[in-house]
Amino acid sequence: GKEFVGAVWPGKVHFPDVLDREARKWFGSKYKFLLDQGIEGFWNDMNEPAIFYSEKNLNKVMKEIKAIKNDNMDMWEVFAFKDLVSGLANNPEDYKSFYHTVDGETVRHDKVHNLYGYGMTRAAGEAFEELAPEKRILMFSRSSYIGMHRYGGIWMGDNKSWWSHLLLNLKMLPSLNMCGFLYTGADLGGFGADVTEDLLLRWMALGIFTPLMRNHSALGTRDQECYRFTKTETFRSLIGIRYGLMPYLYSEFMKAALEDKMLFLPLAFVYTEDSHAREVED
């Protein structure tokens, strides 16, 4: 019966029960202030929901830290201490500690975890239809579930600056299309780790064709704006190609949306009789 207290970027917060219709309506109404400022694009982030720590678990960890404050910790105790602190974020026990109201029934969060991002984005999408019915508002989310493509797009979350994640990006595009998500894209260059110039160039070249083309990286990683590298003219050329292809890309996107088709198809979907095409994933 108590309010669950967790922490994200602003510090301690409460999480709206976006699985409840009235709560969704309340949450969606908060977009009005932003729309009134002329904002027409939204990025719903941290909506798994991510939890940096909960008040309950933080108190527990602080108590254990005080207990070992004056100890002469050996190697194993140091490792245990590190695990104690790192275990604060997104702790599975926290997701078992708060509840939702679904069709009049009380449901523990971890049982419906993947629906939270869906509910948040649905709240926003329904609000946009009411607050700005004449506009085509851009919105994409990090967390989601099947069916959320009715309200917005999805980006692929926190990847790494690895060549293997560039390949993963290629595989995820048709996979997400098959789930209904046409508006999607990755953090070009990778979100975590330090990108190389060659990797960023290759990733930007792929990004030319994805609906969301965004270079995005984490705090504490190498600055990866295009102008920070030596081949600035090559980067400029890639971005120019993107703008030059916009009419074509927009037309192909709308055809896929209106005709219930995929924007990115595996080779096997095109060459159905070619056995080799079924094995190609890059």
Regions found by a protein language model. Name each.
Residues 1-282:
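Catalytic-domain carbohydrate-binding cleft regions of carbohydrate-active enzymes
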